[in-house]
């Protein structure tokens, strides 16, 4: 196809990358641990892990998994952690043992966690002790053979307050003990190739149940190389300082902040709780970061802090925004504060994640999600998958070495997810301009994006419909200054029912992560429907 965006690349960006530069993510990251051994790799809670420390401790954890627990190549290990020092140690250990990591949001409810663990067939979980009660609720149905609990100071030798582990959990090994045991155990380095699955990255499903995008080592090596080729001035080996406030269980931070910047010897400041804005600003004051990533709500939250002007951003080279649309006002205020515009990009869990990004050479906020990365083909299609004319909207379909192999054990979903010629259907609608810049104009799906997190209406509706007194319900997104979008739920009551807005919200809080809980519940006599009985969400949107 005609990749007209290549004319906008400039001389320094190649049209293609080699996805085989490293045989695996393990090979790429082990090289970094040796090359930058004495450099700081991670900073958190006032402590530092060097690349050599990370090498040694992740090796010990890998040995514990392999020789201590009998984990074999391809086994799935769930990781349910915030941005603690144990996260990179656990991930590197899982890879070094030859296993596949299943990333889990620590804020998940028992229902959400149970589905993900059983769907993935996870053998063990590495979990923050503070959310162990969530696991305890479903441990007997989880299929797990071992639980490894993490405290905040694990891996860095810091004595920090630690939440108690729920006593209902059995077969529990503290992470610190796992490291100590692993130090005495042998490790057999697995033979990994590009086709081996590195991550199961779960993403919301239109049926209300999330699906695991099977991301291979080649997928992540490719997206790392694509990002490096596209932003060479933001990737100086051994010189970059990154602040990671976005959660590492999210593919954006995992690929960009961790894998890519670790591979070039960057210093990474972990922010375990970005909701603590005072502490977050304090970290920024200390870090003097050269690279910062965020979503619109994160940038906006920082800009509202009264002391953000005290942060020295003079070393900042690049700020990247993703997950949800960056508002023009946010980018303008960020530019006024830091001297740098936010480079907006676009991608999905299924694409490792980056498909497009605005170039660093841009003159300002473009209002687009940028150009397709090297080795990435994007076509926009209309009815019957026919290509649309330039300037016309169409569904964004993508092909490239960063696109997933498919959803984990979902044959039917995989057949529907790709076009006949192998392009992944994103479900988003976009428009290309004459220079090859892509603008997102709509979502073919009814997905709602709250603070950069995808929310699928069917999941929310399935939970809300189980509330006593609810006859039927439907939800849509509505604009929200703080979160970009918020969930508005419309309910038709069972005749005579006395259910209230507070009742429905309380019910949803029991089974949904906080960002999926409706912000507003409105009661209607009946929901608007088509002549075949389909609820008309477009009519509901006019009521928000």
Question: How would you describe each model-predicted region?
Answer:
Residues 266, 289-294, 303-364, 377:
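Gly/Ser/Thr-rich phosphate-binding loop
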Residues 20-21, 38-72, 78-84, 88-92, ...:
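Conserved AMP-binding/adenylate-forming core of the ANL superfamily
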Residues 75-76, 82-102, 106-110, 118-124, ...:
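A short helix-loop-beta submotif of the ANL/AMP-binding
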Residues 68-72, 184-195, 200-244, 266:
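Conserved adenylate-forming
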Residues 221-241, 251-290, 305:
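Conserved AMP-binding/adenylation subdomain of ANL enzymes
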Residues 13-23, 161-197:
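Flexible, low-complexity linker/hinge segments
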Residues 108, 115, 285, 292, ...:
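AMP-binding/adenylate-forming catalytic core of the ANL superfamily
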